[in-house]
Amino acid sequence: MYNVRTDLAVESREIYKHRYNREIDGVVFEEKTVEEDIKVTNVDILNEEGAKAMGKPIGRYVTIDIPEYTHYDGGIMDEVSHVVAASLEELINLPEERTALVVGLGNWNVTPDAIGPKVVGKLMVTRHLKKVMPDIIDDSVRPVCAIAPGVLGITGIETGEIIKSLVEKINPDLVVCIDALASRKLERVARTIQISNTGISPGAGVGNHRMQINEESLGIPVIALGVPTVVDAATIANDAMDLVLDEMINQADAGKEFYNILNNIDKNEKGMMIKSLLDPYVGDLMVTPKEIDDIIESVSKIIANGINIALQPNMVLEDINKFLN
């Protein structure tokens, strides 16, 4: 069977529903609109049956769809940051004096993969200040520390091993991970933020399966945030072929031999054929928008502000920005 590459739970549900024409048992889907035009979708995987069908662990997956032109409007960016913060706060159940460790996963030398390190560079880190100047830093300020550990190819160390060692050394009560994801659809690239309480597997979206970073491996809750920055080239080619076939079917005379041939094409077999034809030439080619540099900069700011607001509930965004400046 042709498996479409995606890290988004909302897309996994869509693929299953399209393939089997029914909802998944053990999965609850809820959609709402906040701040007038920001769509928030909750996908709750409740049991092993749902997890197997979705190909994802049991837990909650929140998808926030960013409005068009958000990257060019500071006001909308702040609105999305507050929606991200609200979604995080629903998943974070942590007293304000407890420590949070934020991990920016990814390769800072590769723009589509640099979202994690970029977010870390915009965070309000306070753990060191709470120790160095306890009289100046208010008790309501949460101790937050952050790291961008790089990738195995740069460090020679599994990212999961680095994080596990840090957790054992500094004893945080929560880990928040940020990583780049792969999407099924081009229109979701850099236009969607996924938040989950199930942890993350670095590099899984592009086929690099590393050590899992989750509560089971670290012993503390792990919240994962991700933004799709790439799409599999084979998926784009397959979608283009689907559009061509659909248009040819619409223009063909119903009941005629050519119409029947087009209508009986197995789309699953077609997807597998396209994948096998492209593999010798492009391998696992991933495609990203040409404006990815600007997109990563703005999305990282949105996510960083969302994390800052969620981890520092006693501060407003204006005060956080003053602190950072």
Curated annotation (Swiss-Prot):
Residues 1-7 form a propeptide. One of its GO terms (biological process) is proteolysis. Keywords: Hydrolase, Protease, Zymogen. The keyword Hydrolase applies. It comes from the Bacteria. It is an enzyme of class 3 (hydrolase). Pfam families: Peptidase_A25 (PF03418). It catalyses: Endopeptidase action with P4 Glu or Asp, P1 preferably Glu > Asp, P1' hydrophobic and P2' Ala. InterPro entries: Pept_HybD-like_dom_sf (IPR023430), Peptidase_A25 (IPR005080). Its EC number is 3.4.24.78. Signal peptide: none annotated. Autoproteolytically processed. The inactive tetrameric zymogen termed p46 autoprocesses to a smaller form termed p41, which is active only during spore germination. GO terms for molecular function: metalloendopeptidase activity. The keyword Protease applies. Homotetramer. Initiates the rapid degradation of small, acid-soluble proteins during spore germination. Belongs to the peptidase A25 family. This is Germination protease. It comes from Clostridium perfringens (strain ATCC 13124 / DSM 756 / JCM 1290 / NCIMB 6125 / NCTC 8237 / Type A). The gene is gpr.
